[in-house]
Amino acid sequence: MRENRRIKVGVLAGVSALAFSVLTGAPALADGPADGLQEVEMPAGVRIVEGLAPGAGVDVPSLEDEADAPVMSMAAAKAAPAANTCLGTTAAYGAKGCFQHNGDIVWAGDTQKDGMSAAVGVYTDYGRAPEVCINRLGVNTWATCDKDYRETGNVRLRVLRYDGDTGKFYQPESWSGWIPVDGKY
């Protein structure tokens, strides 16, 4: 009886520690940039691609914060990603980005009405020149850049802001982890 209680207390302590580490390890986005926007140098030879509005009837990713989104069930979390699933969702002040493995589509979402555009840089692990997908469609919109990446490769997203008048990129920025192009982790 005593051993059973000890196990329950140990499990509860472990779950509490895990929940605390998730909350402190992934802080919520601020309403604005902490120290203002700071210019970012992009790698030489980066190609800028203007994103297009998704077609009618296309399921677009959510622009709401992950913390506000409904929690997935454990069964759904273990299932293989659906064809239109957006992987590697990454957000920074005013911008959100993700990668749809079916069709190699980069999504760039603009979340702030500040006169700037959302930008999602895409880097590969196999030496392809970096590209940036720009969303000039305005606040609360998604733009897509349809690319073709090597199926055996991985991509990494860099989300930041872009000023179309000056052609400059600005922090705050955020990076995703490596995302398999074929969607299979």
What are these regions (language model features)?
Residues 1-93:
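N-terminal prepro-regions of secreted/extracellular proteins
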Residues 76-185:
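Mature secreted bioactive peptide module from preproproteins
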